[in-house]
Amino acid sequence: MKLDFSLFVHMERTDGSRSHAQLYEEFVQLCQMADQGGMRAIWTGEHHGMNFTIAPNPFLNLADLARRTKNVRLGTGTIIAPFWHPIKLAGEAAMTDIITDGRLEIGIARGAYSYEYERLRPGMDAWEAGQRMRETVPTLRKLWKGDYAHEGEFHKFPATTSSPQPVQDNGPPLWIAARDINSHEFAIEQGCNVQVTPLWNGDAEIDSLMEKFNEAKKTKGQGKDPKIMLLHHGYVTTDEEDANEAAKTLSKFYCCLLYTSPSPRDQRGSRMPSSA
């Protein structure tokens, strides 16, 4: 099995000491280091109204990075499908594929934070978000192929062809954020790759996610060769004390984020599992 390394990065503002402009310049510099260092890809996500993940539209960031990098692939990690109309998503992705000269890859998810659901699509729960994502994913390649009419639960539109068309044959590679076995099976059945993020349980959770992926390959992967990508947090330093302090600071910030945004299930707030 071939193992590649990529950079998953977004802007974070844990205090007011630096402006958003400064944070973006640091983001770009880190991405340039990844490109020069031979990493396979750079991934950046979509989130709204939160300083923990400042990325209102990853396509904008990737279009800018296309002019500042040379070789690295450029991916969305991830687009929150329920916040997009399929025609708009297909068109913006295709334009970004042109701007990046065919380096684009698209990660798609249902979303993780009830905080965003409540503000961008009030009343939507995690189940509906997952169903919206499952409806959106198959439409993308059909819109890129052209003359596609859609009659779904959440979207309806007459025959449409995405304009522009992507550079890559059949469009950019698609990746689905998955946790439970059903989301792994959905991704592979659709001819997509899989993104997984272990949250709380260390190596045991990684083993569990890999087991689900391998099982889904057996049942849904005939004639397909899906890849799996693991997001793992890291911190680069030469100073152990600095590493420990950074871990404490970020853990505190992350925990505050998870437990202060209201959730339909718990008014203290919680992060919903990022299964499809």
Descriptions of predicted regions:
Residues 64-70, 97-101, 188-189, 219-221:
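Acidic (Asp/Glu)-rich catalytic clusters
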Residues 65, 96, 140, 174, ...:
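Conserved, mostly hydrophobic/aromatic
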Residues 2-22, 82-150, 194-195, 200-204, ...:
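Flexible, glycine-rich active-site loops centered on histidine and acidic residues
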Residues 186-188, 225-229, 234-258:
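Aromatic-lined glycan-binding groove of carbohydrate-active enzymes
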Residues 259-266:
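Conserved small/polar residues in nucleotide/adenosyl-binding loops
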Residues 270-276:
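Hydrophobic alpha-helical segments, chiefly the membrane-spanning helices
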Residues 5-7, 42-44, 74-76, 104-108, ...:
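Hydrophobic faces of well-ordered beta-strands that scaffold small-molecule active sites
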